[in-house]
Amino acid sequence: DTVYVTIDKAAVRKSGMMMASDSIPNRMVISLKGKNALYKGDLMMLEMIAQSNWVRPIYVASTVGQENYMNLGDNFVQEGLANRITPFTTNAPGAKNFDTQKTYNNVMNRYKYGGLSRKGIYIDETVMRMCYTHRRIIAQLALHLISEGDKQKANKVLQKAEKELPAYNIPYNYMNGGLDIARAYALLGQTAKAKEVANAVWINAQQYLNWYLTLDGSRFANSMNDCMYQIYVLRQAASVMGMADKQTAAQQEKKLNMLFKQYQEKGGAMPMGDE
C-alpha cells in the first residue's frame, strides 16, 4: 500500500521549492493506505510526479478536498492558496510545511483582490467563501512571520489584510481567521486592534447563540450542535481577548457561563464524549 519514487536530488535543489527538512530524501514515499482502487486521476497524478523530475512545480489548490489528491497531503508545502507537492514528508516532526517567503510574495504582490475594499458592494456567498480563505491564509502568514521573528513583515501583512479585506465588507468571525488575526495583533503588541477583532468575533458568535436560545422544542433540539459550536467559539474568543485585555476577557467568561447555563436549562446536552 505504498509507492516509492526515486528522487533526483540535484533537480530538487534547482527547483526553487522550500527545503522542508535538513536533507533531501533518497525516495519519495506515497502512502495508498485506505484506498481500495486507483482511478485514472490518481494514476495521472502519480505519472506526473514520476516524470516531472521536479523541473515543473505541481500544485493542488488549498480548496480541493482530500479525497481528490490521495494521501499526498503528507508531502504538501503551502505557498498561499496552493499546496506544492514535494518529495519531503512534511508532516514529520521537525519538517516545514509552510513557505513563508513565497506566501508573503503572493499575498503582498501577486494576488488581486478585485476591489473588495470598495464600500457598499454586494458580496455573494461564493465570493465570500474565497474572502474567508484569503483572510485565513493571511492570518496564518502573519503568525508564521511572528514565529520566525519578522514582526515588521507580519505588521505589513496585517495592514494589507485590513486594506484589501476590510471588516465593513467581510466581518470578522471564527471561520475566516478572525481570532488568528487578533492573536497576531496581540503578539505584535497592538492590543487595541487585537481587542477590536477578538470582540467582533465574540459578538458574532454571541448573536448566533442568542438566537438559538430563543428556539423551542424540536427546533432547539436540532440546533444543539450549533449551540455548542458557538459556545466553543465564545470560549476561544475570550481566551484570545485575554492576550489583550484581561478585564474584558473575565467579563466575557462570566457572560459565557450565563449563556451556557441558559443552554443547559433549556435541556441542552453536551456532545458525546464530553459528558
Feature locations, PLM:
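ER/secretory pathway lumenal C-terminal domains and tails of membrane proteins involved
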Residues: D1-E275
